[in-house]
Amino acid sequence: MNIAYRFRIYPNREQEVLLAKTFGCCRFLYNQMLNDKIREYEATKKMLRNTPAMYKKAYPFLKEVDSLALANVQLHLEKAYKNFFRDPKIGFPKFKSKHRSRKSYTTNVVNGNIQVEDHRIKLPKLKWIRMKKHREIAEKYCLKSVTISMEPSGKYYASLLYEKSDCENQAEEFDYEDAKILGIDYAMHGMAVFSEDIQKENEGYFRKSEERLAREQRKLSHCVKGSNNYYRQKRRVALCHEKIRNQRKDFLHKLSYEMAEAYDVVAVEDIDMKAMSQCMHFGKSVMDNSYGKFRELLEYKLTWRGKKLVRVDRFFPSSKKCCKCGSVKKELKLSDRVYLCTCGNRIDRDLNAAINIREEARRMLLAG
């Protein structure tokens, strides 16, 4: 099992120049290799097996940057092709834009070429860089690779990928009759409703900061493109987006941590978030809630502790089924926010669904 730690780094001016050169070389090599593959296939109907070494003679500037970063470019391109052949809907590999593509590169650990110490990290070609190491890393973890990235705001980060032994946290054998199971139902407002009494509301960070973001974007639209004021204002807009993103991630990490610590099993409905955002006209609410990201974080945190995330089938009638008597309503409108049953049960619609998801997960686990 792999785990990544992301720390902010503070390169000096000389290192910033080399980082910019590495980002550019990786983008250039990716585009060149992709272009040659396309031309070769058009001419011969065969796939070209090109490598970074084939380009260093024609483009000597590639020798100035980390060779492992260039090797990873080849791996990323091959992965893009594999993803396309596996599922054409993903799309054919695209060329990387100089201004719109993400500025990052990955390098690997070879013969101790990367070293991590308190408040600094040593990287190939860059030597020692100051780093804000805000948490300790277990000595038993094995460092595999480091990804260096630059945000639109101008901040630099190092993502350290460690390998963790799979046998450390084996899934525990619970008595599912008595296990602590939490059911979660997606909600348009507040992100989710829980089967237990957990009061944790999403702050809707994007909407709260929307006015400020709109103000900064209006200022940007009035700047002359390419001027110093334009780039200065563009950075302010990027900082607004970054703050919203960090607030959202902080909320999701803290909430998923609490769930993983408190419960043995967490059950969620296996809904298609992408389809919901496109088809139900709830795009902004769905994206602001980040429910899909929340499920992803919850799953790895539970697995980390030897616990389980159970996905209940999306066609299970969690909202239409009464959590008391089990009867299923044939007609239930989306506007009906309170569930009323003939047995006398009166309950919030989303809470009823969360309880049903919890009990369905328990049934699935007991059935094996």
Please report, for each region that a protein language model flagged, where it lies by residue.
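Gly/serine-rich nucleotide phosphate-binding loop at the start of the catalytic core
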Residues: 1-70
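Generic detection of short hydrophobic beta-strand segments and adjacent strand-loop junctions
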Residues: 7-9, 128-133, 199-202
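Hydrophobic (often cysteine-bearing) scaffold residues that line and stabilize catalytic clefts
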Residues: 15, 19, 26, 66-73, ...
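Residues on one face of amphipathic alpha-helical coiled coils
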Residues: 25, 29-32, 36, 76-79, ...
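Stable alpha-helical structural segments in soluble proteins, enriched in small hydrophobic residues
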Residues: 33, 69-87, 351-361, 365
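Long, hydrophobic, amphipathic alpha-helical segments used as structural scaffolds
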Residues: 34-41, 81, 85-92, 164
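Acidic carboxylate diad motif detector
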Residues: 50-152
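Positively charged, helix-rich recognition surfaces that bind polyanionic ligands
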Residues: 139, 152-368
